A protein has these predicted regions:
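A broad, low-specificity signal for short, low-complexity segments enriched in glycine/proline
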Residues: 1-5, 117-120, 155
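Phosphate-handling substructures
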Residues: 61-144
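Aromatic-acidic/polar surface patches that form glycan- and anion
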Residues: 18, 42-45, 119, 123, ...
């Protein structure tokens, strides 16, 4: 199986769409993807993602299945230095170094900073969504690995 992840074109966040440059990029992307043998398309519910996919889907005469968990991760946390809400992956190294559990794959969502957001629930929403998608193609999670069932395939999927 080939999974191709494509990020949205240059966004205009104010209108949840694309800038002029983003629209040009989406059109150029559609020319490239036209050469690919893609079996299924999946897309975030956000406008900028749908707009990026629109040219490719139109050229392929296809539709994308909208998966809510593909939207940008929305779990702001409280910055311990400023007291303001912020995205959790944008801390300076000093904050990360003072919170070594953020590097631990079992503890990072339990960190007091991450607990100020809805991190664990959001993380599970995304990972459960990905696991469901992969299981549809015959790849079933078992701890840190995925087992390939007899139902696996060599399809190409754009996300």
């Amino acid at each position: 199986m080939k999974i191709i992840f494509i990020r949205h074109g240059e966004p205009n966040y104010e209108i949840d769409s694309l800038t002029e440059k983003g629209w040009r990029g989406a059109e150029l992307l559609s020319k490239r993807t036209a050469k690919w043998n893609v079996t299924d398309f999946y897309c975030s519910p956000l406008g900028r993602a749908k707009d990026t996919a629109s040219f490719t889907l139109k050229n392929a005469d296809r539709e994308a299945k909208i998966l809510p968990w593909l939207r940008e991760f929305d779990a702001p946390v409280i910055d311990p230095e400023t007291g303001k809400r912020r995205i959790p992956w944008d801390f300076l190294p000093d904050v990360l170094d003072a919170n070594r559990d953020l590097y631990d794959n079992h503890l990072w969502t339990k960190n007091p900073i991450m607990q100020t957001g809805n991190m664990d629930e959001n993380y599970r929403f995304v990972t459960d969504g990905l696991d469901t998608l992969l299981a549809h193609y015959g790849y079933v999670r078992d701890g840190y690995r995925y087992h390939a069932s007899d139902e696996t395939n060599r399809e190409a999927v754009i996300v």
